[in-house]
Amino acid sequence: MNTLIIAVLSFIGFIVAYHTYGKWLARKIFGLDAQATVPSQELKDDVDYVPTKKEIIFGHHFTSIAGTGPIVGPAIAVFWGWLPALLWVVLGSVFIGAVHDFGALVVSLRNRGQSVGEVAGRMIGPRAKFLFLFVLFIGLTIVLAIFGLVIALIFSYYPESVLSVWVEIPLAVVIGLWIYRRGGNILIPSIVALGIMYIAMGVGAYLLPIDLSQIFGIPLLGQTYLNVVVVWTLVLFVYCFIASVLPVWTLLQPRDFINSHELVLALLLLVLGLAVAGLTGRADLTASAPAIASDIPPDAPPIWPFLFITIACGAVSGFHCMVSSGTSSKQVESESDAQYVGYGAMLLEGGLAVIVILACCAGIGMGVFNRVGTGANYTFEPIVAAESATPVTNHDAWITRYATTTTATNADGTTRVVGGWASHNLKAKVSAFVDGGGNFLASLGIPLKMGIAIMAVLVASFAATTLDTATRLQRYVIFELAQTANIKPLTNRYIATAFALVLAAAVALLQGPSGPGSGGLTLWPLFGATNQLLAGLAFMVIVFYLLRRNKPIWFAFLPMVVMLIMPAWAMLHQMFDPQTGWLFTGKYLLFGFGVVVEALQIWMIAEGVIAWRNARGNYPELPPLESVAAD
């Protein structure tokens, strides 16, 4: 019952926040005007600038910002206990994350769809524009390298997810043509597409799991370079190139719209399963996981400040400012839709993060299992206790996925930690959510095999929408940097997209911690702090926008301070901690990147301090229209 109560209270909190704080921001602070000219109308080109109904743009925006962030982050953070993670998700999303996304969207809408980095040049100063865009470029390169790897790993771990994810692409193209070329109604094709997606999940689970390990794995120079992860990464980047250069209505919008329906249905099933499991007493949060963990292993970073960079999406994420000001602002057809899209989508993501926390604690406590078999003949066998030969549940089940101070004896009689923070890799945390969510779905009578397929497709679909949106965003950033540096070839959308993906592929396909194709994991430790630093810098732009328009700034200024201090603190700990710091463990590449990111932050803050004195009430006019139009 405690699991259900926490879920219900969290969801009620989000609903109340939307209709109170969100509405106050929309009316009193940003003054949204349904009659105002928006970029999608003023710069309409049917490629990037496309006026779009709010239901469709909400689907694109939500699925793009969600990705695997609100899954992996909370799945890791419950290591410190479910209560700190829950508080940061609920309070962070209401007062920081949703304000950040909403503010970035409005600022971009009022500046002809320019990115937050471009707007920084006018609100703070020309150097601030270049600094912000450079941080965006670094962050998006890491996102592309990591998310390509994430999807490839999911396809590798869960072959049953592959068919449904790829079936979605031709469905999206058909729906895009139906809506934008023929003006057809969107309801019926959406329902049909949703049905086909779930049929494909069943086919993938029971008949046709697509496992490329049966095909690829060619050894070259003593290493298996053409492994499953490498092949899927290459295929995904080719897809991203095509999706990024096509008009948004052709593939990006309809795919995200289909995704949003599929994902919302999956989330509703999870909530129903959670409710049934909670009411029947099978899902017991407090019996499964500690509210605040007391047996933290020595290799774990401190909860303060690392909680704030571990859970990004689901509370606040700098990547969201790129989506708000990169793709969404170019498609919103009325200012009055901005609260629904910007503030509302972030609260829904917070709801997803709450479900993840409960799935990784109470859901895992319902039982854990191992995958046995290959091809379509695989099954899931429960892990049993050695003494009683009965399936482990509650805390005994939870510690199989979140081992903390499990010890082993060395040859000399001393002990060492087995598990701990080092064991919390990407696979383990994705599996924790998939397994816990599968248990919730099983409470509804859905077979575990089908439930796991639904959960795996959920994760892969979120990550895929983020990947293709991030590719388009990186193209915008490269375009703006190229304009600033007068590099004309990179202002071409095909060349800019190819440059973005070749660079990301070069990182992703390197020999990394998990072998060929895991190079993105090398830069993974940078992502958390760099991503959250972007949120702090985006808040700085929002603050200056409001300051120059003589608006109250406290509601954005306080989050700005938090999101500038916490990521910097975490980054410095990662760089200089005597036991684990990059400087002292020989991770000089990470240390070098850390120095660059911290230097950029300090420089950006200095630019803000310089501009502050003359900013209030001094709002700069927009540049001539032709200088803003994209290639």
Question: How should each PLM-predicted stretch be described?
Answer:
Residues 2, 22, 71, 83, ...:
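Transmembrane helix-loop junctions in multi-pass membrane proteins
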Residues 2-19, 77-108, 117, 160-172, ...:
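Extracellular loop-to-transmembrane helix junctions
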Residues 17-71, 260, 306, 630:
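Membrane-interface "cap" regions at the ends of multi-pass membrane proteins
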Residues 23-50, 76, 86, 90, ...:
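Flexible loop linkers connecting adjacent transmembrane helices
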Residues 52-111, 122-126, 142-157, 342-367, ...:
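Membrane-interface helix-loop-helix modules in multi-pass membrane proteins
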Residues 123-141, 344-354, 427-429, 447-455, ...:
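Loop-to-transmembrane helix boundary motifs in multi-pass membrane proteins
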Residues 275-295, 347-434, 469, 509-518:
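Extracellular/periplasmic helix-exit of transmembrane alpha-helices
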